[in-house]
Amino acid sequence: MKPFGQRLGRFSVKTLLTGLLGLALTLPAVASDTPDLDTIKERGTLRVGMSTFVPWAMRDKQGELIGFEIDVAKRLAADSGWQVEFVPTAWDGIIPALLAKKFDVIIGGMSVTPERSKSVLFTAPYSHSGVQLAASKKLAEGFSKLEDFNKRNVKIAARRGAFTVQVARETFPKASVLQFDDDAQAFQEVINGNAHAVIASSPKPEHESIKHSDSLFLPFSERLSKGNEAFAVRLGEEDKKAYFDQWIADRTADGWLQARYEYWFSTLDWQDQIASGQ
């Protein structure tokens, strides 16, 4: 029988070699599956996951995508020498689609939240908006306080999978929250008199209350919440985050992001461009 030390040494070397071989076989597969910054540069195209909601991203009368997020993604790609490919995705499935590598980054007005940060890596914020409520003049007549909407017979509409659903549930825990695939459907539910109010990212409630002043009003002068929007990439993609952070810093410093935000969020100069039903 061989000494214990000799047997242990041989076993350890064999085990080590086996482990290193397995690691060597695994690493290339992991690297090739990760569309990191170098892969985007080689491809020459940035694939952007987004969802349509006014004025972040929407269709014009020719069917082309326009909006704040579209401007941001196009400028990012142009500054980087890339093409841009937009991947329209249902909002409630946009994070799973990112994790499934359907695209490289989410640029879609996504608010930074602790819960989302468990699944994705956020960049520095590139815009700062918030959430507001528009109410039905018919069903919510005389409502002016938060507690007026926090009742069991009150129905509040919101876009499925959006941060607004969380705001609705936390602010009005007694009310029923009705979820729809997009903001347009949620607002239409209130306009039709089937819900007391709709919660959406500003300035959608403000704009819709002006457009439909006969049926909608803003009961609160202050927004329900203020938030930060950021790009989202997959956890561990620090190279992409650093690159995007620098771009955001540059476009913030030269005033471009603020100028585009003010155009899309503080004016209605673009309104005659968009297709109906959005």
Please give the residue ranges for each predicted region.
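A ligand-binding cleft/hinge motif common to bilobed small-molecule-binding domains
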Residues: G93, G109-K118, V167-E170, I191-N192, ...
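Hydrophobic/proline-rich hinge and linker segments of small-molecule sensing/allosteric domains
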Residues: V48-S51, F122-S144, F231-R234
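Flexible hinge/capping segments at coil-to-helix
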Residues: L37, S136-V154
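Extracytoplasmic small-molecule ligand-binding "clamshell" domains
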Residues: S32-G109, K118
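Periplasmic-binding protein-like
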Residues: H128-Q132, S202, E206-I248, T267-Q278
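Short helix-initiation/N-cap motifs at beta->coil->alpha
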Residues: I70, F86-P96, E141, L178-N192, ...
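Short loop->beta-strand "edge-of-pocket" segments that line small-molecule binding or catalytic clefts
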Residues: G44-T52, L146-G161, S176
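Ligand-binding clefts/hinges and TM-proximal coupling segments of bilobed small-molecule sensing domains
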Residues: D33-T34, F163-V177, P219, I248-Q278
